[in-house]
C-alpha cells in the first residue's frame, strides 16, 4: 500500500517501534501473515516489517476517523497488558472501551444491560478477544486487530502486524493509532506538532510495583528527614547555667523579708 509523503514513517517513530520490540513476532507463522515477515532470526523468531506495520496503523486510523460519532467505535482488550491502553485510547478519542472480560451477548443480545451497537470494533489480540470478533461477525461489524504472526485472521478486516504480547509494544501501537486519529480530526494541527501525551501513559503498570515504588519513596523521604542537620537554635539536651544569686530580684526579696520582722 502506497501512502502520501505526509504519512511516511519518520525516523523518530521507527526508533519508538524498535525500542518497544514491536518488530519481534512469534516463532510460528500463520499463512495469512507471511507477507508481513521481514526475516527469520537464527533462534526462530520472525522479525516483522515495521514499514507494513506503520501502513496498517495509518489505515486503521483513517477508518476510525471516518466514523462520524467517536462513541460508535468499540475498543476491546481482554489481555491485561492492553487494558490500560484501551482506556487511555478511549479517553483521548471518545471511543467506547471494553476492558477486561468481554461479556457474551454484548453485541448480539439486546436484553442485556451492557448491550452495544458499535459501527467499528478494535481488539488487542484475536485470540483473547475471540468472543468480540465472533459476535462482530454475526452483526456485520468490521474488525481491526493487533495481530502477531501466529494470530488467526478469521473475521478480521484490518490486521496490524505487531508484537501483541509485550506491554510496551501494545501500549505504543495504541498510542500511535490515537495520535494519528487526532491528527486526522484536526485536534493536533499538523504533523510537525508533537503530541503532549507521552507513550508511557499507555503502558501497563503493575499495581504491586506501583505500591512498592510508593513505599520506597516514602522510606527515602523519612531517611532524608532523619539525616537532616539540627540547627543550634533548636531544642537540645543542654541547659544554660544561671547564677540566681546575682540576679536583680535577690535584693528586693531580702528587703521584703527584713521588713516583715
From Swiss-Prot:
InterPro entries: Ribosomal_uS2, Ribosomal_uS2_C, Ribosomal_uS2_CS, Ribosomal_uS2_euk, Ribosomal_uS2_euk/arc, Ribosomal_uS2_flav_dom_sf. GO terms for biological process: ribosomal small subunit assembly; translation. The keyword Ribonucleoprotein applies. Keywords: Acetylation, Cytoplasm, Ribonucleoprotein, Ribosomal protein. Disulfide bonds: none annotated. One of its GO terms (cellular component) is cytosolic small ribosomal subunit. It is found in: Cytoplasm. It holds the Pfam family 40S_SA_C. SUPFAM superfamilies: Ribosomal protein S2. Required for the assembly and/or stability of the 40S ribosomal subunit. Required for the processing of the 20S rRNA-precursor to mature 18S rRNA in a late step of the maturation of 40S ribosomal subunits. This is Small ribosomal subunit protein uS2. It comes from Scheffersomyces stipitis (strain ATCC 58785 / CBS 6054 / NBRC 10063 / NRRL Y-11545) (Yeast).
Amino acid at each position: 500500500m502506497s501512502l502520501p509523503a505526509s504519512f511516511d514513517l519518520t525516523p523518530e517513530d521507527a526508533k519508538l517501534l524498535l525500542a518497544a520490540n514491536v518488530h519481534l513476532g512469534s516463532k510460528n507463522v500463520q499463512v495469512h501473515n507471511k507477507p508481513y515477515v521481514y526475516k527469520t532470526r537464527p533462534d526462530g523468531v520472525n522479525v516483522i516489517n515495521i514499514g507494513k506495520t506503520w501502513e496498517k496503523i495509518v489505515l486503521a486510523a483513517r477508518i476510525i476517523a471516518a466514523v462520524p460519532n467517536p462513541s460508535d467505535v468499540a475498543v476491546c482488550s481482554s489481555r491485561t497488558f492492553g487494558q490500560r491502553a484501551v482506556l487511555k485510547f478511549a479517553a483521548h478519542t471518545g471511543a467506547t472501551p471494553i476492558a477486561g472480560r468481554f461479556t457474551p451477548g454484548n453485541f448480539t443480545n439486546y436484553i442485556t444491560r451492557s448491550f452495544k451497537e458499535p459501527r467499528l470494533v478494535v481488539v488487542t489480540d484475536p485470540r483473547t478477544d475471540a468472543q468480540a470478533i465472533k459476535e462482530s461477525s454475526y452483526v456485520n461489524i468490521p474488525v481491526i486487530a493487533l495481530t502477531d504472526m501466529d494470530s488467526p485472521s478469521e473475521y478480521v478486516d484490518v490486521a496490524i502486524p505487531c508484537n501483541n504480547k509485550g506491554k510496551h509494544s501494545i501500549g505504543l501501537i495504541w498510542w500511535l493509532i490515537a495520535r494519528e486519529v487526532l491528527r486526522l480530526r484536526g485536534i493536533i494541527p499538523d504533523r510537525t506538532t508533537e503530541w503532549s501525551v507521552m507513550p508511557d501513559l499507555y503502558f501497563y503498570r503493575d499495581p504491586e510495583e506501583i505500591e512498592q515504588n510508593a513505599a520506597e519513596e516514602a522510606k527515602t523521604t523519612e531517611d532524608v528527614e532523619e539525616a537532616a542537620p539540627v540547627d543550634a537554635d533548636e531544642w537540645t539536651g543542654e541547659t544554660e547555667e544561671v547564677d540566681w544569686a546575682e540576679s536583680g530580684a535577690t535584693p528586693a526579696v531580702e528587703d521584703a523579708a527584713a521588713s516583715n520582722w
